[in-house]
């Protein structure tokens, strides 16, 4: 999308890791999001994608596997939310890679302000993945097999406190499922502009994505605020907790 070209880093996080699927994204240069859990067959699939698509200039690593793939293929490296960068020591471990990073979404802004390294990205917008499931909940609930799969889209899980979570499928060499908080983290209108922002647009429509990016671009440029549509079930996450 044209509006995405205004961002510093564009990350593609496909539901299906397949060269043909990724080829449909009309973007000249981007980072590939690397899942946090990979078996050898998954690594082989991602290696094939990294080799075939020259538009991939970097990887967003959510585990050590992503870091090593960046090194093997000489790609730029972004330490994503899955790396849980919690303090300056965590950042220092990777200084030789010259990489960018996302601050842990378990940190408050007070804790982030204590970092000596101020160049990280604050997770400012989007639904947070709480867990990756290697087993198949569809097989368990629907009593089906892979060759007679009964997956027909996202399913909803409710815990004992009646909190709702989406279960979304991600396919690499096999199916994985992500447990996603339905309360969208949203800091727009509350956070100051002197930061780098990580915006997770997954699950948004093209129009919602455009308005979200435009709003944050307006915020950092000091222009007129372009209000994001008010959404239900938003949260501040840990960002405004009074801990330090």
Regions found by a protein language model. Name each.
Residues 1-244:
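Active-site pocket-lining/capping segments in soluble small-molecule metabolic enzymes
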